[in-house]
């Protein structure tokens, strides 16, 4: 029996005991209860194309029997669909699921005969199903291509449903928007994100697929009310759990400094619990909504709002706040700093390095930073997140690391992570920390040059080792005694050591004798060489004669003067 087999399945798998999951499983596995196959590929919604007729089992209960007791007995077998009532009290009719009940035998285990029912009370009647009887996921599964990924998920922000459709779903975008608006409770507008969030203010361009062009929303999260214009600010409903988790970390006397506060999902719940908060956001619309939400939740006395660049907020407000709290002897809490800007937050961590290097202050309280980032890759996401923080800080995270937590999966091989660590004295006061990441073309060339030098050193080392090995092998060969290989009957015998009584040659004596012969030969040649005769004196040149005549004339003049 199908029903008995299904009961065994639900007994072994407790998660199928939930009412919605059980009937959804049975509805989608029953061919009679899925939309007609003719709607596949529809791009313009035609609600009439979903109409179909099926035959379903029904119990006709006599009026004299206990109708409520019988309904309780068959509760797990009821046909549950959208806009359909399986139990009609006025007509005493109960519609059962066609997959669970095929014959009267499927109902015997319930004991309906003991309650006055017989096989004649079970009938099969025709009923009409249409567009209104299926949920949005059942409609879209029947319409969209089978061989491609369907619509996986969406987020609901107030009355707006936010989609992020992939390219192959764009031809069906208007149909998808209409179906979701019809089926999702409280939805008045459906929008699709056109581009990724890459601008300064973290908002994105959107396309209205269906509904009202009204982006002013109001919602409740972690016990607080938030009102804002969804088209001008950043909001992610999937981070609701993470917002609450960080707020729960705060203890009595702690304070929160929110660098990228947005409309206040971290700051306002913390302030509502009695903690002091400094909240900042660069987006003027986010700042305006932040101030409004503080007043809406009546926490404006415990929160101070700023409209600054995140780097300026760190260098100015956070710096002065850390100094003031370390000078305040009555402060005993922890300074928490949240940095929820996954795409850029890690790059701003370098601004904490040496933040207090010029301040003469005794540090007693070390702030705890909660920075968010995207870990991209197939490796361990915690190691990737830690590496991003260490790379941008320029120092390794040692004992000051508190926690690395997974937040959510953004895309395949892309996870959002939170790294919580303390700003130690080494980070805040040290002025010799060098960032490990290249900051200019020069540093890149220096790093490349160092790599080339190391490569040359390694190559030279390998050559030296090779030369030494060759020298050792040559020395071994010199020591070996030459032997003659003799073969006998084709077999090569092992070489034997050659022994001989050769007279030892004295090389030194031979060299001395050769030198003596060269000396004798040299003396003999020099002795027989004829002596050179002196050359006759050359006659005086004309120049010399003129000089002599000049001297004689001068001597004659001297005598005449005397």
UniProtKB/Swiss-Prot annotation:
Pfam families per UniProt: TRM5-TYW2_MTfase (PF02475), TYW2_N_2 (PF25133)
Q: Biological process GO terms, please?
A: mitochondrial tRNA methylation; tRNA N1-guanine methylation
Compositional bias ranges of the Basic and acidic residues kind = 523-534
Q: Where is this region: Disordered?
A: 523-562
Chief localization: mitochondrion
Transit peptide, start-end: 1-41
Among Gene3D superfamilies, the record links this protein to: Met-10+ protein-like domains, Vaccinia Virus protein VP39
Compartments, as annotated in UniProt = Mitochondrion matrix; Nucleus; Cytoplasm
Output the InterPro entries linked to this UniProt entry: MeTrfase_TRM5/TYW2, SAM-dependent_MTases_sf, TRM5-TYW2-like_MTfase, TRM5/TYW2-like_N, tRNA_Gua_MeTrfase_euk
Residues noted as binding S-adenosyl-L-methionine in the record, renumbered to the chain? 243, 281-282, 340
Tell me the GO molecular function terms: tRNA (guanine(37)-N1)-methyltransferase activity
Q: What is its EC number?
A: 2.1.1.228
Listed A to Z, the keywords are: Cytoplasm, Methyltransferase, Mitochondrion, Nucleus, S-adenosyl-L-methionine, Transferase, Transit peptide, tRNA processing
Quote the catalytic activity from the record.
Answer: guanosine(37) in tRNA + S-adenosyl-L-methionine = N(1)-methylguanosine(37) in tRNA + S-adenosyl-L-homocysteine + H(+)
Output a single Gene Ontology CC term carried by this record: mitochondrial matrix
The task this protein performs is described as: Specifically methylates the N1 position of guanosine-37 in various cytoplasmic and mitochondrial tRNAs. Methylation is not dependent on the nature of the nucleoside 5' of the target nucleoside. This is the first step in the biosynthesis of wybutosine (yW), a modified base adjacent to the anticodon of tRNAs and required for accurate decoding.
Q: Fill in the subunit field for this protein.
A: Monomer.
Family, according to the entry, reads as follows: Belongs to the class I-like SAM-binding methyltransferase superfamily. TRM5/TYW2 family.
Name used for this protein in its record: tRNA (guanine(37)-N(1))-methyltransferase
